[in-house]
From Swiss-Prot:
SS bonds (residue pairs): none
UniProt-recorded name of the protein: Methionyl-tRNA formyltransferase
Function: Attaches a formyl group to the free amino group of methionyl-tRNA(fMet). The formyl group appears to play a dual role in the initiator identity of N-formylmethionyl-tRNA by promoting its recognition by IF2 and preventing the misappropriation of this tRNA by the elongation apparatus.
Family: Belongs to the Fmt family.
Length: 299
């Protein structure tokens, strides 16, 4: 099929690769413009742009799609379907209507749960037992369109947002290829009005660990914010990111170091399995502890 691909971050790259590998004609790749990055703040192309250029695909990165010229350029591509995955721009109705069969979105949740910007983070933060990927026919509302195909996956007891991100990206790549192959037989399923939740962007204020909370909540926070933005605490005045954890045996005063990198919470305890000191690379807990001594209690 003749497609337009619209995506920006690393999550979208396996999808683009899968579409090309399946033999689809990608008429153009739309992504966010290069952003300043690194110490020199030089413009850096997005992961999708970098991959598209390697694949020899035409890349477009308009700042907006609201203008008549941008919309005409999009329509002129003559796409049968636009595949959208974490693109980052709102698609006006004229863009949604331009492809012959509309725009299909790959969304990393089991809609209508976790509509919005941060569905992977929010699923772990909420303690969901499962999540998944939906292929959705886009409409004007925020992730409200009918679902064409879905698949659920269990969330591991020690899984982080980073690990789940990679699994769902691969699942989305497989599902979109399947959905395109089965387009003629798929029946759009309207989303139910019950069970709707919204996955708001992660606020940095959420990231500080409060050891007075129950261990189950602290564990979800650490795993749900790993690797970005990263839950954190202060150890001897140094901000340390906590990037991996598991529930542990033991109890004590909130923030008390019980053994190794196991800390008491308001109820129960959490073992930190991976962390990152300021200005250093992430490391397993054992390596972190070789380089620093924990106080008797953390704030």
């Amino acid at each position: 099929m003749r497609l337009v691909f619209m995506g920006t971050p690393a999550f979208s790259v396996p999808v683009l690769d899968a579409l090309v590998a399946a033999g689809h004609e990608v008429a153009a790749v739309y992504c966010q413009p290069p952003r300043p990055a690194g110490r020199g703040k030089k413009p850096r192309p997005s992961p999708v742009q970098a991959r598209a250029e390697v694949l020899g695909l035409a890349v477009r990165h308009p700042v907006s799609l609201k203008g008549a010229e941008a919309q005409a350029d999009f329509a002129a591509l003559g796409a049968e379907i636009a595949v959208v995955v974490a693109y980052g721009l709102i698609l006006p109705q004229a863009v949604l209507d331009a492809p012959e069969h509309g725009c299909w979105n790959i969304h990393a949740s089991l809609l209508p749960r976790w509509r919005g910007a941060a569905p992977i983070h929010r699923a772990i933060l909420a303690g969901d037992a499962e999540t998944g990927v939906c292929i959705m026919q886009m409409e004007a509302g925020l992730d409200t369109g009918p679902v064409l195909l879905r698949e659920a996956v269990a969330i591991g007891a020690e899984e982080t947002t980073g690990g789940l991100h990679d699994r769902l990206s691969a699942l989305g790549a497989r599902l979109i290829v399947e959905a395109l192959a089965r387009r003629a037989e798929l029946v759009p399923e309207p989303q139910p009005e019950v069970g709707v939740t919204y996955a708001a962007k992660i606020d940095k204020a959420e990231a500080r660990v409060d050891w007075s909370r129950p261990a189950v909540e602290v564990d979800r926070l650490i795993r749900g914010l790993s690797p970005v933005p990263g839950a954190w605490c202060e150890i001897a005045g140094e901000r340390v990111k906590l990037l991996g954890s598991r529930l542990a045996e033991g109890s004590g005063a909130a923030g008390q170091v019980l053994e190794g990198f196991t800390l008491a919470c308001g109820v129960g305890a959490v073992e930190i399995t991976r962390a990152q000191r300021a200005g250093r690379k992430a490391a397993d807990a054992a390596e972190i502890l070789r380089g620093m001594t924990l106080p008797a209690r953390l704030d």
